[in-house]
Amino acid sequence: MTDLRSATGPYFGDFGGRYVPESLVAALDELAEAWEELKVDPAFIEELKELHRSYTGRPSLITEVPRFAEHAGGARIILKREDLNHTGSHKINNVLGQALLTKKIGKKRIIAETGAGQHGVATATAAALFGLDCVIYMGEVDTERQALNVARMRLLGAEVIPVRSGSRTLKDAINDAMRDWVTNVETTNYVFGTVAGPHPFPAMVRDLQKVIGEEAREQVLALTGRLPDAVAACVGGGSNAIGIFHAFLDDADVALYGFEAGGDGADTPRTAATITKGRPGMLHGARSYLLQDEDGQTIDSHSISAGLDYPGVGPEHSWLSDLGRASYRPVTDDQAMSALRLLSRTEGIIPAIESAHALAGALELGKELGPDSIILINLSGRGDKDMETAGKYFDLIDAGAEQS
């Protein structure tokens, strides 16, 4: 197999690139140049590693879940516990690196987009830690379904701006954040949350998330004496997935599975299964798979999960799909919520709805691969933020009761 781990962008096969207004080219050049220097700078590497040790709580644990696995044909299932990180998800891995970079290039203000609010919370957290001004753009639909995370961001000192244009979700939040960056590029760094967007974001965010797979590869080897048969993760933009996939890309015997948000079903209009149902196009400065109409216009996505409700996907995932190195499958809202409840009741771990898509996919995967197989799942976040959605979905909240 070719050395897939060495891909650095700006292109991943036919995907990626940088299709942006002239006004952003200088900022992206500055960012790319700074990252190329810092990613091999021993002092920066050590400072980030120490931050992760003392602040994030890395390395994150792995947890085998045998009672859950009984429902997956008896396969051994091991979770990589990114839900245990400070702020509750994998997002902090990327944000601390980008916030540290912001300090190094002398900028005082950071902006970010957020869907589920996890990237926004992580960005607001890093801004508080480093003394940076912080503005978060969040679709109005998402501010309503993730109100808890909005409160967290504001408590941390960030300004949260609800985006009322378009579908009022993640895609529109990115559009407004990009507009802010164009206007304020001298003072502001855009802390992008996933492995999409224009170069250098897909490669840089991947570089900052690949710690997940590097740790997990060693941990699974130590626990089981061999590599897993399959690695599974949910895919929206795709940063948690590429983070765990990357260490295994050149291990030909390890199958990689990305589980997309199927919404009401991949064959319905209400879906976010971008690789399953989309075709190549341009969005947010890069070429990748997109959900689009016959005229090439991006169409609205749907998922019960705010973090997967995005009509695009990272260019490296598009490339891995075309190469056949990774497989991408849709998981419906109902399948994800069922898996969320199953993990909660069999193992006492409440996952984020995003992560529950990977859990649901792995239940089917285990039946395909059989009882001798080992499946590693990236549990990308915890479910605290989703209690209102889960409470309504499963009718868990007493009528008239107020949430405390």
Swiss-Prot record:
Q: In which pathway does it act?
A: Amino-acid biosynthesis; L-tryptophan biosynthesis; L-tryptophan from chorismate: step 5/5
Residue pairs linked by disulfide bridges in the UniProt entry: none
Q: Which cofactor does it need?
A: pyridoxal 5'-phosphate
Q: What InterPro entries does its record include?
A: Trp_synth_b_CS, Trp_synth_beta, Trp_synth_beta/beta-like, TrpB-like_PALP, TrpB-like_PALP_sf
In the record, N6-(pyridoxal phosphate)lysine modifications are located at 91
Reported EC number(s) for this entry are: 4.2.1.20
**Domain of life of the source:** Bacteria
Catalytically driven reaction(s): (1S,2R)-1-C-(indol-3-yl)glycerol 3-phosphate + L-serine = D-glyceraldehyde 3-phosphate + L-tryptophan + H2O
Which one of the record's GO molecular function terms can you name? tryptophan synthase activity
KW Cell division (keyword) present = no
Signal peptide coordinates: none
Give the record's keywords alphabetically. Amino-acid biosynthesis, Aromatic amino acid biosynthesis, Lyase, Pyridoxal phosphate, Tryptophan biosynthesis
Provide GO CC annotations from the record. Answer: cytoplasm
Provide the family line.
Belongs to the TrpB family.
What's the stated role of this polypeptide?
Answer: The beta subunit is responsible for the synthesis of L-tryptophan from indole and L-serine.
* Binding partners and assembly: Tetramer of two alpha and two beta chains.
Query: By what name is this protein known?
Result: Tryptophan synthase beta chain
Organism of provenance: Clavibacter michiganensis subsp. michiganensis (strain NCPPB 382)
